[in-house]
Amino acid sequence: MFSKLAQSSIKAMF
């Protein structure tokens, strides 16, 4: 759950 959100945020950042 949270992992998916965190990955999305990281992908958008980088």
From Swiss-Prot:
The lineage of its organism: Bacteria, Pseudomonadati, Pseudomonadota, Gammaproteobacteria, Enterobacterales. Induction: Expressed at low levels in exponential and at slightly higher levels in stationary phase (at protein level). The gene is ymgK. This is Protein YmgK.
